[in-house]
């Protein structure tokens, strides 16, 4: 009897897991020597999404704008992609973008975080968690 209860419980858990979609979650990251909390990453990605969906940019900047992934990062979501600055002092609203970016796709799914810090020329390298 205990065996059948265990099997029934396991079946219930599996059905819950199958019914729950898996989404890409923004997590904390480090770009160069700058640490960003999960909430900072989420805020930047959400701002990028809002501007993108409203066909708008932050201040007089060009962000968000197309990110072509010339570096060949293996993002967990398909493109096309948009890049948007992430700043430690709050959400980017224009001006100097700094070196660090969040990347979203045009469905507003978080793809990763990248930085110019440590990259040659105008290229990017992945922040922690982005390969």
From Swiss-Prot:
Active site per UniProt: 65, 83, 116
Q: Does the keyword Nuclease apply?
A: yes
The record, for InterPro entries, names: N1-like (IPR000026), Ribonuclease/ribotoxin (IPR016191), Ribonuclease_N1/T1 (IPR051386), RNase_U2 (IPR048269)
**Taxonomically, which superkingdom?**
Eukaryota
Q: Look up the signal peptide feature and give its range.
A: 1-25
Q: Which UniProt keywords apply?
A: Disulfide bond, Endonuclease, Hydrolase, Lyase, Nuclease, Pyrrolidone carboxylic acid, Signal
Enzyme class per UniProt: lyase
Give the reaction(s) catalysed. [RNA] containing guanosine + H2O = an [RNA fragment]-3'-guanosine-3'-phosphate + a 5'-hydroxy-ribonucleotide-3'-[RNA fragment]
Q: State one molecular function term (GO).
A: ribonuclease T1 activity
Q: What is its EC number?
A: 4.6.1.24
Disulfide cysteine pairs (residue numbers): 31-127, 49-108
Family designation: Belongs to the ribonuclease N1/T1 family.
Stated name of the protein: Guanyl-specific ribonuclease F1
Please tell me the species this chain comes from.
Fusarium fujikuroi (Bakanae and foot rot disease fungus)
Q: What is the lineage of its organism?
A: Eukaryota, Fungi, Dikarya, Ascomycota, Pezizomycotina
